[in-house]
Amino acid sequence: MTRPLFITFEGPEGAGKTSVLEALVSELKPILGDQLVTTREPGGNPISEAIRQILQPEDDNGMDDRTEALLYAAARRQHIVETILPALSAGKVLISDRYVDSSLAYQGGGRDLGVDNIWQINQFAIDGLLPDLTIYFDVPSELGLSRVMANRQGKIDRLDKESLSFHQRVRTTYLELQHDFSDRIKIIDATQPLTDVISDTRALLQEALNSRKG
């Protein structure tokens, strides 16, 4: 008998987590079949995807920082209800590209709204639901942003365009979260070649999948 497994991928801009996820899903899908569900935040269902379009335009839309934080939490709540909980209730493996730690890092740290404040907002949204495993891909802000500018080919949103100091605060907050919740959040050195990052991530996923059995 197997139990459900909730895994999240986190990281600052340019860490390469989405590329790693795509590579490993192509390996896992033939093994797990419909027992594997992949999703993203903000998004994962029509309502949350609509909120994503508001949150991530190419240019600054004048959104207030607290409005931004509340919209991310709202998108997350719908994502949980419509996508995450049904998958976990069915005993599946769900991997999400971002979850609540993104709000803590980006709005709590980057926007300087305070991690505790953002946590309180999101407590109402997640109702205690935390991942079994969070894989955090760490990269210095300067390197991450240079990757974004080189690789996204015009797909630059307003968060990408934030100041270097904003992105440095995001990374600092992620590292603090990883330190404080090291049992859940595992760190990957994302400055390595992509093949090495994939290999390190594969090992963490395999360990989590093995623990699911029993």
Swiss-Prot record:
Entry-linked Pfam families: Thymidylate_kin
Protein family according to the UniProt entry: Belongs to the thymidylate kinase family.
Enzyme class: transferase
EC number: 2.7.4.9
Positions contributing to ATP binding: 11-18
Name by which UniProt lists this protein: Thymidylate kinase
Record keywords, A-Z: ATP-binding, Kinase, Nucleotide biosynthesis, Nucleotide-binding, Transferase
Reaction catalysed by this enzyme: dTMP + ATP = dTDP + ADP
Lineage of source species: Bacteria, Bacillati, Bacillota, Bacilli, Lactobacillales
Primary role: Phosphorylation of dTMP to form dTDP in both de novo and salvage pathways of dTTP synthesis.
GO cellular component terms given for this protein: cytosol
Gene symbol of the encoding locus: tmk
Residue stretches in coiled coil: none
